[in-house]
């Protein structure tokens, strides 16, 4: 089956495809997902306190976005699943003899994805230009534009690079 730009079905997509009342079910315990809708899009994000991270559907809900087409929903933006930091009980078992550690800096995750045009999202908002930055009059979309203009000269120059890799509609670009 084809699920947006992804060739296999994850647990969350399977749940959505097999439950017509998925929004109501996933918003309640044990999932407690935050579901934000904007037009034909729905963004799903776990709740750090109330969601049950033993469930794969919860771990996959890290700002993924689905698009409605009639009665069906297709995954079109999948940043990556929940992961845990070193020392946390659910952290991956790392083979340190083969690992290379550089640096991990926490930030705000934003994604660039294609659906009849390029879209910027945060992990909690479908449209980054509707996501306010605390303490400022700017949005995350404004900050993205400023950073791109500084580094690439213009958003158009940056999008030429994003278009050149052939990923349009097939992958999610992630920035933090």
Where in the sequence are the language-model features?
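Core nucleotide-handling region used for phosphoryl-transfer chemistry
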Residues: 3-176
């Amino acid at each position: 089956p084809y699920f947006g730009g992804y060739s296999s079905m994850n647990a969350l997509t399977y749940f959505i495809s097999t439950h017509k009342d998925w929004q109501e079910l996933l918003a309640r315990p044990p999932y407690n997902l935050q579901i934000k809708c904007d037009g034909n899009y729905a963004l799903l994000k776990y709740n750090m306190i109330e969601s049950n991270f033993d469930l794969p559907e919860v771990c996959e809900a890290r700002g993924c976005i689905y698009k409605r087409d009639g009665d069906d929903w297709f995954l079109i933006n999948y940043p990556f699943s929940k992961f845990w930091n070193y020392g946390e009980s659910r952290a991956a078992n790392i083979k340190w003899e083969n690992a290379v550690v550089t640096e991990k800096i926490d930030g705000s995750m934003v994604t660039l994805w294609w659906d009849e045009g390029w879209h910027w999202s945060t992990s909690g908002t479908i449209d980054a230009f509707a996501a306010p930055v605390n303490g400022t009059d700017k949005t995350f979309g404004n900050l993205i534009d400023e950073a791109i203009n500084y580094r690439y000269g213009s958003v158009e120059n940056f999008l030429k690079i994003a278009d050149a890799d052939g990923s349009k509609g097939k992958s999610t670009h992630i920035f933090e």
